[in-house]
């Protein structure tokens, strides 16, 4: 077995490396308010992966879920309030648990709920980052419709991962609007064969993002001091689907505690390259697989009907239905 010294750094905790026999994987779907179709895909993923003992989780960001204001109409009418029908005003948590009830009951899917405050309590640097001028100028944050979890995936993921009693050796992270035109067991087998035990598997890693990239200045002071804050030192990648090793997630956790963070599209690949973690390109990408990609329900039905050829066993983003 590899020496534990290979898994430690001078300012990181003594994390025990995964045992040679521990090849446990988990797949986490990042959600905020998933559609019925997205929940159906999550259930199908759990069915596909149950035989190979991959733990499937839903990581649900519950920030900015509006509470229903009390109705004044019954008071004005001097009448008792009507009982609400059960189908009315379900929260995302209720919708997730209802749609996946049978999977949850048999342990095929587990749910982790958190919000922005949980992230800030775990990583106090995020309180300062939320006041970043560039972040506050963005449409998403100026309207107050998005939480930090939308752009700081590493901390959102580690809020879940660092509290597990038994950590899996590798964690897949899927956005809930990703589709795979085949069995996810096939994807995991392809990655094991082609990428081995890489610490980070991600798509389209690039050095030097455009200076016009909106999120370039969204970083902590400690990040700039350690890695630089200009485009010549920064890597970016698409994060719709990624796989992390235990030791890489633990390292990201330590750095966040040390106030080293930035927008996660840049944070994850920049640290991986700067600190010599193993990085591999995510295979089996379909078209589209991009932040502005769109796949309709009709198109997805056609893609998944193609059981052979160039559309089979590929990842697509984004399934906006």
Model-identified regions with their sequence ranges:
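Juxtamembrane luminal stem/stalk of type II transmembrane Golgi/ER carbohydrate-processing enzymes
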Residues: 1-26, 80-86
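Short beta-strand-to-loop acidic/aromatic patch adjacent to the donor-nucleotide binding site
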Residues: 168-177
């Amino acid at each position: 077995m590899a020496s534990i010294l290979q898994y430690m750094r001078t300012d990181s905790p003594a994390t025990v490396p995964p045992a040679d026999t521990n090849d446990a994987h988990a797949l986490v779907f990042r959600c905020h308010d998933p559609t019925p179709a997205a929940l159906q895909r999550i259930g199908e993923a759990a069915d596909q992966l149950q035989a190979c003992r991959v733990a499937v989780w839903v990581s649900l960001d519950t920030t900015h879920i509006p509470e229903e204001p009390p109705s004044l109409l019954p008071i004005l009418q001097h009448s008792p309030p009507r009982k609400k029908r059960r189908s009315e005003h379900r929260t995302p948590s209720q919708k997730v648990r209802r749609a996946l009830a049978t999977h949850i009951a048999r342990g095929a899917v587990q749910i982790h709920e958190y919000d922005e405050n949980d992230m800030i309590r775990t990583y106090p640097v995020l309180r300062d980052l939320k006041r970043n001028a560039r972040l506050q100028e963005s449409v998403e944050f100026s309207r107050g419709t998005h939480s930090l979890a939308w752009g700081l995936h590493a901390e959102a993921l580690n809020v879940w991962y660092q509290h597990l009693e038994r950590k899996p050796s590798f964690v897949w992270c899927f956005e809930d609007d990703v589709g795979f035109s085949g069995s996810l067991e096939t994807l995991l087998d392809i990655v094991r064969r082609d990428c081995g035990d890489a610490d980070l598997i991600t798509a389209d890693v690039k050095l030097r993002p455009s200076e016009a990239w909106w999120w370039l200045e969204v970083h902590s002071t400690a990040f700039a001091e350690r890695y630089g804050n200009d485009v010549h030192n920064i890597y970016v990648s698409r994060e719709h689907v990624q796989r992390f090793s235990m030791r890489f997630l633990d390292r990201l956790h330590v750095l966040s505690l040390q106030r080293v963070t930035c927008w996660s599209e840049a944070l994850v690949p920049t640290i991986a390259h700067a600190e010599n973690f193993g990085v591999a390109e995510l295979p089996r990408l379909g078209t589209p697989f991009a932040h502005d990609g769109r796949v309709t329900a009709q198109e997805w039905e056609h893609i998944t009907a193609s059981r052979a050829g160039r559309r089979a066993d590929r990842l697509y983003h984004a399934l906006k239905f």
